[in-house]
Amino acid sequence: MAKKITGYVKLQVPAGAANPSPPIGPALGQRGLNIMEFCKAFNAKTAQMEKGTPIPVIITAYQDRSFTFEMKQPPVTFFLKKAAGLKLGKKPASGSKTPGKGPTVGKISEAQLREIAEKKMPDLNCDTVESAVAMIRGSARAMGLEVVA
């Protein structure tokens, strides 16, 4: 018989930097899950990734207080900022104040868009790479990035 699911917790945790402080501790603690067990497992799985990369994670909590977690690809905005050479960190560079109208904050090529789309395909709600590129192009425009050929 399968375990009964009591809920899901969605978090964005920096790779290799999971610790029991907020937001992880309170989110898992209120479900009665072992916080340190998650932190150790997550850090072990993300050890080979670049430190600080934001990783979306979905934690499934079961009635017996056990859990499983699924990691997704980093957000599209992370890939776009990295490809455009914008500042990454705790307070990332904000995009354009008037996307599509005013000055652009950076440039990104079609090849870079395609590369990002191929990485994000499993997490996106689309069937073809072309539609994934179109979605990511829209995100780039909304951030104030200019797409060049």
Curated annotation (Swiss-Prot):
SMART domains: RL11. Keywords: Methylation, Ribonucleoprotein, Ribosomal protein, RNA-binding, rRNA-binding. One or more lysine residues are methylated. Pfam families: Ribosomal_L11, Ribosomal_L11_N. One of its GO terms (cellular component) is cytosolic large ribosomal subunit. One of its GO terms (biological process) is translation. It comes from the Bacteria. The keyword Repeat does not apply. SUPFAM superfamilies: Ribosomal L11/L12e N-terminal domain (SSF54747), Ribosomal protein L11, C-terminal domain (SSF46906). One of its GO terms (molecular function) is large ribosomal subunit rRNA binding. Belongs to the universal ribosomal protein uL11 family. Forms part of the ribosomal stalk which helps the ribosome interact with GTP-bound translation factors. Part of the ribosomal stalk of the 50S ribosomal subunit. Interacts with L10 and the large rRNA to form the base of the stalk. L10 forms an elongated spine to which L12 dimers bind in a sequential fashion forming a multimeric L10(L12)X complex. This is Large ribosomal subunit protein uL11.
